[in-house]
């Protein structure tokens, strides 16, 4: 019984440290800046996923801690309103910011690429196809009507996520 109490204390202490992540600070601009204590976005959640597990694990999905919170809160609120919609986020930046090819921005943790949510011909929400053949989704071109092969842009889902208010701290408090 004594070993169980010790194990609980160890796990509790470890958990406290894992939760006590340092907040981020951004410097400069999105085009000429850097980031301290960048936070990596999760690979996936109930209604979202990264554009590429490999690129994410290679360190291309770090953001400012406030941006991290805002994105996850927006996905959570959207999940409540649109349970069947899947979202895909793209590139964001490096853990310490700085140059981020091929982008001219994404340098201080405040830039995020969001891929459009799409539906197939049965009107089911599906993930945007991202692979090397289409430069991980960045080379996809939809028609003026939002069509690409058997996919159509889910404009209703885009409008739904735009309705939610997530109030971040002022940028002045985020950067130096």
What are these language model-derived features?
Residues 1-3:
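Positively charged n-region of N-terminal signal peptides that target proteins for export
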Residues 5-13:
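Bacterial N-terminal signal peptides
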Residues 6-7, 87-91, 95:
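Short, compositionally biased strand/turn segments
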Residues 16-20:
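Sec/Tat signal peptide C-region and signal peptidase I cleavage site
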Residues 22-89, 150-175:
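Active-site acidic/histidine clusters and adjacent loop/turn architecture
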Residues 90-94, 115-118, 176:
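Active-site-proximal beta-strand/loop segments in catalytic clefts of secreted hydrolases
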Residues 95-109:
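Charged, often glycine-rich, active-site loop that binds/positions anionic groups
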Residues 105-142, 149, 153, 157:
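Mid-length scaffold segments of soluble, non-membrane domains
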């Amino acid at each position: 019984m004594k070993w169980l109490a010790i194990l609980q204390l160890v796990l509790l202490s470890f958990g406290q440290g894992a939760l006590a992540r340092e907040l981020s600070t951004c410097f400069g601009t999105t085009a000429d800046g850097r980031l301290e204590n960048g936070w990596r976005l999760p690979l996936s959640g109930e209604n979202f996923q990264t554009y590429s597990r490999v690129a994410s694990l290679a360190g291309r999905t770090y953001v400012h801690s406030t941006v991290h919170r805002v994105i996850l809160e927006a996905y959570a609120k959207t999940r409540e309103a649109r349970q069947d919609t899947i979202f895909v986020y793209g590139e964001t930046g490096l853990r310490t910011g700085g140059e981020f090819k091929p982008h001219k921005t994404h340098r201080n943790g405040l830039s995020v690429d969001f891929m459009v949510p799409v539906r197939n011909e049965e009107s089911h929400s599906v993930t945007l196809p991202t692979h090397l053949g289409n430069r991980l989704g960045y080379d996809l071109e939809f028609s003026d009507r939002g069509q690409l092969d058997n996919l159509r842009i889910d404009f209703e889902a885009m409008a739904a996520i735009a309705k939610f208010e997530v109030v971040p701290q002022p940028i002045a408090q985020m950067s130096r």
